Design a protein with these regions (language model features):
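Eukaryote-biased RCC1-like beta-propeller repeat architecture
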Residues: 1-307
Length: 307
């Protein structure tokens, strides 16, 4: 069974984790700190099975997490800063159980089944309550649909209402998709707490940011529209119009790493509406699963799994 439910890419595109439709977890790529969870530090240019009964996986820099269907959270990889949440600073080459009662995770925060957002690498300290979904980083959607940036060390910050997806741009701005599929640009930490931002487009259901310049760290964006067409957002012109570059049709989900749109500095994945997984960009670490660590593709190519 090769259908994919979700994919996450870590380490700047150096490794990838895929949850298949049978809830098995597969990994591929570089493995110098055990980030594949295979029990060794040997990398793989073919996908290898790591564990079963997984509902969600999240990849960090050189570490990763998985939530199992029984609500347990598992962690592996680099742990020099205690980022795995296991109470040690010892790297883990195989998954270790670090928490119970978990509904979701990203690379830094876990969401409990009772709606608490916990910072994994900070002793599972509570960052927020009443959370419905966690997005990337510190962004969270509350049970009332409001979008917040949450933190253990700092005050939680309200961003806007009626959100279904959002991402930050690294410059204190946030792209938000609302329940009516409108796309908004909102200034975070604005002194004008009455402003909900500026509506810039309509007809989208997911948005994500990705790094497009290693030196400056400037972000780019990708959009999935209501018709399941995946686009790069190149820029917004002076009249507020989106300048888009289509990537693929019939896409249900995606994962992006560092990239410049016109060259080969990124590794990306998308899953079509039938569950087929595709990769594009660079294959320098073998994450295309083709058995080699070379090559580049401007267009999505099929990712295969061993029988």
């Amino acid at each position: 069974m090769n259908n994919a439910l979700s994919v996450t890419v870590g380490g700047g595109g150096s490794f990838a984790l895929v949850v298949k439709s049978d809830h098995s977890l597969w990994a591929c790529g570089i493995n110098d700190r055990g980030q594949l969870g295979s029990g060794t530090t040997q990398g793989s240019a073919e996908y290898i099975k790591i564990m079963d009964n997984v509902s969600k996986a999240a990849a960090g820099d050189k570490f990763a997490f998985a939530v199992k269907q029984d609500g347990t959270l598992w962690a592996w990889g680099a742990n020099d800063r205690g980022q795995l949440g296991d109470g040690t600073t010892i790297d883990r080459l195989s998954p270790v159980k670090v928490a119970d009662g978990i509904a979701d995770t990203n690379a830094y925060y876990a969401l409990t089944t009772d709606g608490r957002m916990l910072e994994i690498g900070n002793g599972f300290a509570e960052a927020a309550t009443g959370v419905s979904r966690i997005l990337n980083g510190s962004l969270a959607i509350m049970t009332d649909g409001s979008l917040w940036s949450c933190s253990v060390e700092y005050d939680d910050y309200y961003i806007t209402d009626d959100a279904i997806s959002a991402c930050e741009d690294g410059e204190a701005n946030c792209y938000v998709i609302k329940t009516d599929h409108s796309l908004w640009l909102t200034e975070m930490f604005s002194e004008d707490e009455t402003s909900s931002g500026t509506e810039i487009a309509h007809g989208y259901k997911d948005v994500a940011s990705f790094e497009i310049d290693y030196d400056g760290g400037w972000p780019g964006f990708v959009l999935l529209d209501a018709d399941n067409v995946l686009y790069y957002l190149d820029y917004i012109d002076g009249d507020g119009n989106l300048q888009l570059k289509k990537i693929a049709d019939n896409i249900a989900a995606f994962a992006f790493s560092s990239v410049t749109v016109e060259n080969d500095c990124g590794t990306h994945f998308c899953i079509d509406t039938s569950g087929q997984l595709y990769a594009f960009g660079k294959n320098y670490y073998g994450v295309f699963g083709k058995g080699r660590t070379a090559g580049y593709s401007d267009t999505p190519v099929t990712v295969a799994f061993p029988n």
